[in-house]
Design a protein with these regions (language model features):
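Extracellular/periplasmic periplasmic-binding protein-like sensory domains
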Residues: 1-43, 117-119
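Generic alpha-helical secondary structure signal
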Residues: 18-22, 65, 112
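Segments of small-molecule ligand-sensing domains
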Residues: 30-42, 52-111
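Tryptophan-rich aromatic "cage" segments
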Residues: 109-121
Length: 121
């Protein structure tokens, strides 16, 4: 079984010493009552990091116009839980945050990357 993925998976041993994963687990221990290895929880945490980025860039101007300006002008933004090298890029005509990923294969125990970082449309 193969798939494509763009983020670090906190359930996998290879990421246990990663500073971003350690920070995520510390946050989860304090604020999250569910399973911190759950992919939905990790995804929510990543979305919250993106929202924090946007709000910081907006500063005191939280108008819809300014929020949309920031959201649609992200250039090479890296978030801690994204797979190394994955960058977020958006524009006024392309809201899709990233087209970068690695191919992963299930080895019977966990998903293992088997390609370098790829870019696709």
């Amino acid at each position: 079984m193969i798939s494509a993925y763009y983020a670090k998976d906190p359930s996998q041993k290879r990421w246990r010493d990663d500073p971003a994963i350690k920070e995520y687990f510390a946050w989860a221990k304090q604020y999250y009552v569910g399973d911190p290895e759950d992919g939905i929880a990790t995804y929510g945490y990543q979305v919250a990091q993106a929202l924090e980025y946007v709000l910081r860039k907006c500063g005191d101007n939280l108008s819809r116009e300014n929020v949309m300006k920031v959201v649609t002008s992200m250039k090479d933004v890296e978030f801690p839980l994204l797979y190394p090298g994955v960058k977020v890029n958006t524009s006024a005509t392309d809201y899709h945050p990233s087209r970068q990923f690695v191919m992963i294969r299930f080895d019977g125990k966990e998903w293992v990357p088997f390609t370098e970082l790829l870019t696709g449309d």
